Amino acid sequence: TLIYENQKTITITLKEDQKELKDVVVIGYGTTTKKDATGSLQSITTKDFNKGSIVSADQLLTGKAPGVRITNNGGQPDSAPNIRIRGGASLNANSSPLIVIDGIPVDNTTPAGVSNPLSLINPNDIESFTILKDASAAAIYGSRASNGVIIITTKKGSSGAPEFNYSSNVTTGKVGKKIDMMNGKQFTNFIQTYHPSLTNSLGIDDPSTAVIDDLSTPEVEGRILSNTDWQDAIYRTSISTDHNFSAKANLYGKIPFRASVGYTRNEGLVKTNDYERLSYSLKMTPKVFSDHLKIDANAKGIFTNKNAIDEGGALGGAINMDPTKPIRDNSSTNRFGGYYQDFVLDGSGNPTNTISGQYNPVALLMQRTRPERAVRFLGNIEFDYKMHFLPELRAVVNLGLDASEAQIKERFSNNAMATYRVINSGADYVFNPGKNYEENQTMTNTTLDSYLVYTKSLNGFLTKFDIQGGYSYQNFKNDGNKEIYRYNETTGVREVLPNDNNPNNRYYNVLNLQSFFGRANFDLTNKYLLTLSLRADGSSLFREDKRWGYCPAAALAWKL
């Protein structure tokens, strides 16, 4: 202990200084703070996102938002999720929420070959999600928001020093739990015990002997029995990689921008099920005219490529296929590329195209290809102008384009059982490989939103209010052709299935949506909040006298 003279005691008291952070959240056609929000909404930002190998945006949200249930109904890397906000217990009903990306409502109808609309945006470009859960919060988007709204905001540029970021991860996956099935020996014992007359159908014929099974012996004579785990035969340990690079800076000290590029390769748990995605994005947010005009320009592009499998046939076959049958049959009489097929013989002992059991699930995967490719561009530019003569008044115009092209080509290999058909003579069976299905599609979604916002702070009973009104226009076009190929018993070849009502096999449809909307927010004595909104939606789907519908809403809140 050190003691020095003239020691004094000094008492220091820290004065409490409360500063409330403005927790800004994005809502329909604007922003607010959480404390001023009247509707039920939730904001989820990057710090809350799920980590790991993320293929689509919905995987960032899974399990993160109370009242939001996200389930997958397929094993493919880009399988479409079922998203339900506050209920909607049906897994199959069309109860999907409206998706809004940087102010542009996107169509839940995906391009051909794309299962999940949220897989067409790079998850690494997302800054936040705002989920509008109740009717009052979502009503500003009208009838399409009846199942809730998910607003996606992408990352912005930097106003400071340049920043560069690269991230990469490699993940592996495997089937957590297979269905418990009998192995070859157990299945053989089952047949011997309960269906002894069928023992000569087990396995495959032993070409080295003409003996048939003697039911009085415990062994199965004259048959070669395998012990095939068909689930192991179609599943694999998957390896997936994800690479992302981004750069953000402030060009000339006036134009914050962010650019990114990403590459994802995802192997499905089922063999031959592969998915690739290449993405890019560019965002600029300059301010001009003494910060009176804010510009938000976005451009995002996605290229996807996947091989879609016959998931139902392969998975079902792996459960139902006889475990005493082999995967491969390399005998000289095999006609199916070395894959075993359990076919029915004709009167001459030749194989027909009729399956007596299940298609070989491995052959279903290996002898069929279905490349599905899609290209998508999503861009918009928003002008937010604060009037020089009246700073409380803002005019906002948002122009957007969502355009995509897609192509699907399904083909069978030369010895695929699925192409094995009898020719017109009824005596000979031949293979008819080649095209089975082809589709080309173009989709566009053009958007225009324009509205005025007046905001004013006052002293007295009415503390603050803002009023806005505007017009929204969206036009959807879907143009494509779909060709289905079938075996022609007269010509003996695969050719396009004729359609007298649509000789060109083309489909084309246009949907036009126009809306007027308004909203008023009132802050009374800085304690009570009142929100009133109304939207009128007009759709070209309905006849002229029934085209318009109205969505009014009101909400009242009390600040605690």
Which residues does each PLM region occupy?
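Exposed, low-structure sequence patches enriched in small/polar residues
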Residues: 398, 470, 519-521, 533
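Hydrophobic, lipid-facing positions within transmembrane beta-strands of outer-membrane proteins
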Residues: 81, 148, 162, 168, ...
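Residue-level signature of outer-membrane beta-barrel architecture
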Residues: 154-156, 249-251, 282, 286-288, ...
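Transmembrane beta-strand segments that form the barrel wall of outer-membrane beta-barrel proteins
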Residues: 168, 261-265, 530-542, 560
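Surface-exposed loop/interface segments of Gram-negative outer-membrane beta-barrel transport/assembly proteins
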Residues: 159-226, 269-273, 279-378, 396, ...
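Short, small/polar-rich motifs associated with maturation and membrane association
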Residues: 1-288, 293-300, 378-379
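Short glycine/threonine-rich loop-to-helix capping motif typified by GTGT followed
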Residues: 544-549
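Repeated loop/turn-to-beta-strand initiation elements of outer-membrane beta-barrel proteins
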Residues: 254-257, 291-295, 390-393, 460, ...
